Amino acid sequence: KLKEINLIQAHIEEDAGKLIHAKNNNFTYIDLNRCGSPLLEIVSEPEIKSASEAKSYLTYLRKLIKSLNIADCDMEKGQFRCDANISLRKNKNESLGTRTEIKNINSFRHVEKAINHEINRQKEILQKGDKIKQCTLQYHDKSNTINIIRSKENTEDYRYFPCPDLPPVL
């Protein structure tokens, strides 16, 4: 069964590269191979209710983008990635809880596993009576673990700045 997922926006950003946190030492490496490459970020409404829905949505979105010749979406080359935002609520009538974001998930299988992992993590925190802290997370597929890469206190911490060198796309 198809489910309609509404989009909030689509915008072009410039890839800034990535940080690689080495586990065997205290070093963080910077990979600038994709730095400066344009990327299309598509932001959807918070209407996806499960990890399997997220996987289905992304599979469809990738197929659509490829069929329209917008991008190759080669996941092995980092050309199609997902940032998953997760927030829980007790029932449909309540507003969404505090959001966490898992960055740069690079396969549909990992999207499903990472989201399920974070849902379980948040459930455990809430069942203890503690509060979810807004943060950015990284998923490690080999160990099926998540770690916090930075805390975010408010919307300003996301640091969105328009780039004067990029013209608006209408």
PLM features: what roles do these ranges have?
Residues 1-170:
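Basic, nucleic-acid-interacting segments
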